[in-house]
Structure formats: C-alpha cells, structure tokens
Amino acid sequence: MKRALISVSDKNGIVPFAEKLVELGVEIISTGGTKAAFEQAGVPVTGIEAVTEFPEMLDGRVKTLHPAIHGGLLARRDTAEHMEAIAAHDIKPIDLVIVNLYPFQETIQKPGVTLEEAIENIDIGGPSMLRSAAKNYAAVTVVVDTADYDTVLTELQEHGATTFETRQRLAAKVFRHTAAYDALIAEYLTDVTGETFPEKVTLTYNRKQVLRYGENPHQDAAFYTEPRAIENSISAAKQLHGKELSYNNIRDADAALKIASEFKEPVAVAVKHMNPCGVGVGETIEEAYLKAYEADEISIFGGIVALNKEVDAKTAEHMSKIFLEIIIAPSFSEAGFAILAKKKNIRLLTVPFAGNVEGFEKTSVNGGLLIQANDALVEDTTSYEVVTEKQPTNSEMKALLAQWKIVKHVKSNAIVVGSDKQTLGIGAGQMNRIGSALIALEQAGEKAKGAVLASDAFFPMDDTVEAAAKAGITAIIQPGGSIKDKESIAMADKYGISMVLTHVRHFKH
C-alpha cells in the first residue's frame, strides 16, 4: 500500500490513524479541513491540488471530481490496459480511501434549519470517491466508518495489506452507507416538495440492536430505527434499568406508548400482545395506575405499562408488587426509580411524551410495502351526532370520549366497555363484532351497569346494541355508516340508551 486519500468531516481518531500510515510508508493525500488538521499535527500530507493540478473551486464544491483521482481509484491493477492508460496520463494508483460525508442528517435535525443549509450539506465528491473505491475493492481499501480504523491498521501492520475479505466487507458497508445517505436526502427533499406518495420510495434505517430472537425463538431479528428521530417513540426510548428489550417487548411498548399519548391527563396503559388490557385515568399518576390495574388484575401480570407522567415513589410501590416486563414513563423520581430498580428483571425506560405522532406507518406484505398516514386524526367533536332520543349526560359523554381514544388502538373488531376513569372490558380481534362485544361485556360483568361502550367501526346488525343494553350499558359511541344504522338506533331507543355517531372509523388490523 503506497497512497491513501483522506477527506473526513468527522475527524475523531483520524490524526493518529494517519500517523500510523505514515510510519508504514504510506503517502497521505488530503483536502481542505482534513489537510489543515494534518498540517497542524505535523503529519506529512500532499494537497489534492498537487495531484489534480487544478484548484478547488465553487466554495469547495469541486475539488476531488477529477480523472487524476477517480482514475487512480478505478484502474484495475490486473488489467494492463488500465495501468498503461493511467500511466500515460501520469496518474498514480490510490490504494486506500478514508472518507466520511458532510453531516446532512445532523444538519436537517437542527431547529430552524433552512433549505439552503441542508443543500450545502449534501456531499457530492465524498460519495463519488467512496463508490469508485468500493467498486474496485479487489485492489482498493475503503473506509467510511471510524470503527474500522483499527481493523485496517492491524492488517496493514501485520501483513502489509488488507485481506480481500476485509476489502469486500468494507465495500459492502460503503454502498449501504451511500445508499442510506442518498435515501435520506431524497426523503427530505420529497417532504419539502410536499409529495405524499412518490413513484419510488427508498427507506433507510440504522441498526440499533441485534435481538436474541424475533416473535418466537426460531426467528432471527434485529431492531432498526429511522435516522430522523421521532421523540415520542420506542425508537427514542432511553433504557435506565434491566436486560435488553426483546422483539415482543418493543412491539408491545410501541402499542402502549401510542395509547398513552392520546391523553393529557395522567394515564396508565397496560398492554399484552399489542392490545390494551387495562387503561386508567386519574387526578394523579398513582390513581391512574391503580385504575389500570383494577381494570384487569390478571392480564396485567407480565405486561408492559406506559404512563404519561413521572413515576413517583407511591406509584412505584404499587407497581413493584407484581411482575411487569417494562415500565415506560417520561421520568422516574429518584425514590421511584430506587424502588423499581430492586427488581432486576424489570426494564425501565424513559420517553419524552409529545402527543400522537403524525406521519406515516409502514406495513410489509410478501413482495411489497403498504404505507398509510398514521391514525392520528384530530377529530372535531362538534361534528359528532347524537342520533337517539336519549341525550348522553355530561359524565357519559366524558366516558364516551375517553373510551373512543382507546378503542382505536384495539385490534379489530374492537369493543371497549368503560367509564371516564378506566376500561372495564376489552374485546379484541374477533371475526364478528358481536363476538368482541360479548367478550368485553363478560369481562366487565356487573361493572357494565352504568358504563359506556365504544366500537371502532359500525354495527352491521343491532345485536351488539341489544347485548349492551341487557348488560346495563347506558351510552354507545361508534362511527355509524351501516345500511342498518336505523335498526341499531331503534334498538338503542327501545332500551333508553344514548348513541353518538362520530362518522370516523378506526379499523386496526
């Protein structure tokens, strides 16, 4: 290895790396700020202008886009015609490229960033050099990640060259890196133009964690997160205590966070298998948790609980009495954390709560991807319609609105029975609506008397209303829209139940 081209925006570790290369007899070629850093550190360096015999121009936009650089990178060492061609133009081969790119991701995440600032942080020369070097990995070593410095140096020191396997691995990493870089730029500019569903979608995610296994032990899995952080999400969670999250933990925690984000008042949400098993609302977070626990004392065991307020000592004492997989909250008081951290198997996570996340959700199908807007519609309650003779009381309306926030997060067909303070029965995932209703009503038992019922979609028949009436339900909220709405309304009138139509459906598959 005789020549290395180094041009980096992240200069961590680059000076000692270059010093080791010089000790190995490698000539260093560099540009701009990287060259200045080497000169300041006393590292011998050749400026890019000396190689290209052409000055940097356009405020640095053009400096390495030159045949003297790319010829030296792309020439196949095993092809005589290539080597003769570059020799004829006095171009020398470049054996090692160390490049990392302008910080586009970091730039667009800055508050108040302008489009001009974003565009100026789109790297052109860097990806070009990386791709040229990676294409010719048979002869050229290319490094885009500072984590690979030690591997490359060790091989050079021990063997005088890198192995083919290492060069191939690093080349693959480069193409992943440049593809992700371009995907993020495309996503950002697409957002700027306002296009919702462009003709091509290129997604990029960063691996956060290799998981022990997936949904089941025989399934391999990993957790990837979006480059642009979403604050109120499991991907932004900070783990304070406990062992690593599992695949199922992450999915359940995501579901719990979405429900908890629906409420401004203190709320506690218990989730099992991505469905809520108990939701409680209170004046304090302690009261909210107790309501969630009372909602289903059996199912909450081994579940995930999300709370939208700080977990204090009193709440922690209650929670420590049962086995919970995960507790998620904006924060834990010092005393609350100390109480819960005594349990080594519990996972404690903090997430900043900022309301429901707008944007898009993605669902994979074999051979494709479905993309839709998140179900984060801010509904105009003034457009809700009371269609029965009986009007809901103020307390009933409060309960209806609370359960309406919850039912949208239950797997369809979804029925939730509850009050303004808690869920009392949840029927999820049944193939017919009356089946879910009967489960929810049975779970609520005697507590159904005087409670309300929420349905994520319309009633195809009046049987759900009749079952609700016989259980003691006094008010119902549902989207409406069935050709048999009149029959359901008539059944509600027959039993003196109030019914509110929202005209908004919330299927969840």
UniProtKB/Swiss-Prot annotation:
Keywords: Hydrolase, Multifunctional enzyme, Purine biosynthesis, Transferase. Its EC number is 2.1.2.3, 3.5.4.10. GO terms for biological process: 'de novo' IMP biosynthetic process. InterPro entries: AICAR_Tfase_dup_dom_sf, Cytidine_deaminase-like, MGS-like_dom, MGS-like_dom_sf, PurH-like. Belongs to the PurH family. The IMP cyclohydrolase activity resides in the N-terminal region. This is Bifunctional purine biosynthesis protein PurH. The gene is purH.
